[in-house]
Amino acid sequence: MKYAFETLSEDDFEKLVVKICQSLMGIGIHSFSKGRDGGRDGYFEGAAQKYPSTQTPWQGKFIIQAKHTTNVMASCADNEFFSNKTSVINKEIDRLKGVASQYPFDCYLMFTNRPLSGVVHPKIKKHLEKELNISYADIIGQEDLERYVDDCSELITQFHLLKYMLPDRFYEQDIRDVIVLFSQQNDDWLNKKEENEDSDDNSLTYADKVEKNRLNN
């Protein structure tokens, strides 16, 4: 099920991430707090209960981050999020290197409500592990967020996510396709009419505004 996470406030998104992490790792996770460097990090120390799995859980000191966006068109493949030197991820890497110099950590996990494709995911994961010099780093995108919420019905209630459930969206190209389809269908009917004047006339007809108003009334 799709949820409009972009409509949540930044604080509520962070609280949602904490609840998910409590399910994945344990209740010992510390909520997001603002450090001296301006970053907002969540913390956990120990062995995760079931991340990435119960058979091979991560363990050690964790730093967890939530990166929220209100832009429905944003994705993890955007240059401003990953590729650029000043991208969101590269800025965080620079900041976290400073954190690690004083408070070393073993695992890093970023949550975002941006869509995360199978193409860019391994690139970001590898980049984080290399630049942070740790063995365990990953990013969780919109798709996995939706799966975690689906598995935890209490999150749907607590964060009122049903009212944010996305309806089907129609775009300009969809409307154009429908218009073209009706136009082609009408042309077919008109051609059949010309071939057989005695047939029933089921074609679409056009009327000027005056005649249209008379027919509608």
Describe each region flagged by the PLM.
Residues 1-217:
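Mixed-charge (Asp/Glu-Lys/Arg
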